[in-house]
Amino acid sequence: KDTDTDAEGWIVINSLRGGAAAGGTRMRIGVTKDEVLALAKTMEIKFTVSGPPIGGGKSGINFNPRDPRKKEVLNRWYAAAKPLLKTYYGTGGDMNVDEVHEVIPICQDNEILFPLEGVVKGHHKKNQEGTDQIIKQLSKGVPLIVTNEKLTPIVEKKYSVGDLITGYGVAEAIFHYYNIYGGDVKGKRVIIQGWGNVAGAA
């Protein structure tokens, strides 16, 4: 529970397979512990199928994302989560939480090198030089603005790699399915449940 607002949140780590776990931070009115538990399990399945070979995790905060105190809540959230985020848990943006404009700078304000620092340390187990190199690459690549019109829906919107990468992965997975099993994606219909971080980019 937050000290200054009615915000309440949970971090769920389904397992520390491979030495680490990861999953984004979401915020909305009505987030529950059971929802975060289910999402952490789903992240575990995602990583099992697509890699890296780590455990699933998730952060969820029951709070109105339109409240003007949102950034203060996120600041206290990441300050409280710092021991995990520095050692074996990694996070990012999710529903109503922007990776580039909120997660990365707020983590850095709390002396967390990057929101995935815990995954780099827990899973990759590099020496300090190797850890610094990976963090540097992530810090440069995730907020990088995508300018190739074949990779972004609207160049003028200045979407970052972090905004688009999950949806891009879903779209590529569909193309690969048809390459492996035959058929053609043309003429196929899709059902989109929600229009969040994944579907919006896909």
Residue ranges and their predicted role:
Residues 190-192:
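Hydrophobic Val/Ile/Leu positions in short beta-strands of Rossmann-like dinucleotide-binding domains
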Residues 194-196:
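Glycine-rich Rossmann-fold phosphate-binding loop(s) that bind the pyrophosphate
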